[in-house]
C-alpha cells in the first residue's frame, strides 16, 4: 500500500486543518496517511513513505518560515529523497506583498533533495473555502497519480 506523510507547521490551527483535509482526501484514495507536526520528527522519516508533504504557513510581512519549522527545513538539506513524490501547500495572507513564500521555500528544498514533484505548490489565502477544498482534493489526486507512475524499488 502506498504511504504518505504530511508534516505541518501551524500557529492558529489553520494549516493543521489544511493538512487534515489533505489527509482525508488521500485516505479516500486508499493511501495510508500519517499527519505529524514538524517539531515531532526529523526529515529522514520521509524515507519510510512514498508521498512526502509539507503544509506550512508563512509568518509576518517579510514572508518568513515559521520558527518552529526552521530546523526541519534546514535538516532537509541532509536527506536524499530520490524516488519520493512530494507536494507543498500552505496558508498565507494576500494583504502582504509576498504571498506564501514559505510554500515556495519548502518546494525548493524538496527539489534540492531530489524528490519528484507530485503536485504544483498550493497556496491558500487565510483559511480554505470550498474552492480551496476542491483544489486540495485535486492536489491529492495529483500526488497519487504521480506516485503510481514512479518505479518502486524491489
Predicted regions mapped to residue ranges:
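Short acidic active-site motifs
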Residues: 40-45
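FMN-binding flavodoxin-like domain, especially the glycine-rich phosphate-binding loop
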Residues: 2-3, 14-17, 25, 29, ...
Amino acid at each position: 500500500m502506498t504511504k504518505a506523510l504530511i508534516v505541518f507547521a501551524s500557529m492558529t490551527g489553520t494549516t493543521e486543518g489544511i493538512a487534515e483535509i489533505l489527509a482525508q482526501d488521500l485516505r479516500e484514495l486508499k493511501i495510508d496517511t500519517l499527519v505529524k507536526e514538524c517539531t515531532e520528527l526529523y526529515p529522514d522519516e520521509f524515507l519510510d513513505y512514498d508521498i512526502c508533504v509539507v503544509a506550512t504557513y508563512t509568518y509576518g510581512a517579510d514572508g518568513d518560515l515559521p520558527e518552529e519549522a526552521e530546523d526541519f527545513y534546514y535538516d532537509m538539506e541532509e536527506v536524499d529523497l530520490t524516488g519520493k513524490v512530494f507536494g507543498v501547500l500552505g496558508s498565507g495572507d494576500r494583504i502582504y506583498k509576498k504571498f506564501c513564500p514559505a510554500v515556495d521555500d519548502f518546494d525548493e528544498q524538496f527539489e534540492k533533495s531530489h524528490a519528484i514533484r507530485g503536485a504544483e505548490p498550493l497556496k491558500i489565502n487565510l483559511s480554505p473555502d470550498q474552492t480551496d477544498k476542491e483544489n486540495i482534493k485535486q492536489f491529492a489526486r495529483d500526488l497519487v497519480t504521480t506516485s503510481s507512475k514512479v518505479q518502486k524499488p524491489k
